[in-house]
Amino acid sequence: TGGYNLANEYFNITHPYGIWKDTGIRMEGDAVKSMTVAFLEMWNAAGNVKSKELVPEKYVINHAYQAQQRGYVQPYADSPLDGEQVGEEVYISMANKAEKYCWFITPYLIITDEMTHALTLAAKRGVDVRIITPGIPDKKMVYSVTRSFYHNLVKHGVRIYEWTPGFCHAKMSVADDKMATCGTINLDYRSLYHHCLLYTSDAAD
């Protein structure tokens, strides 16, 4: 899972926006089952053809895996069809639980008042809150809107950095060396509320 799409710029074969920065992780073990089922359910929902639906049981291997490390990985799916904002709630939860630091990387920053409140409140209580956004935009209008959020966040202690070598398409977060996320959800309305996406959260303790 991660931000990669199947296009040349994602692998720096072409360079329309400078150096393209993205992230992805390879999943192994039981967590893959959950992600496979979520993908197939969304595939079926989008296809809307009963006769061509993919049966999850056909693609999921029923095999027990021995954990290699402590902690857990929790895949989850977000969808505009169920009225729940799982992606945003996970980000807000991380900001609320963070004690030392909470860092985000996102290509677009267009957030709700609730997300803004969580980030600024964390910064006010002494948490090191940082956000990395692209220094070179792929969409100029969205880039302008992204920058319009800087002032209020910085005013309340959130640190914002722009990755200047090119376009940063990564969507990741990490907090206190205990919580981390990597997936396809940006910190923006469209991604948080209107995408059918897969995401994963990893807690080390």
Give the positions of each predicted feature.
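Charged, low-complexity intrinsically disordered terminal segments
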Residues: 1-201, 205
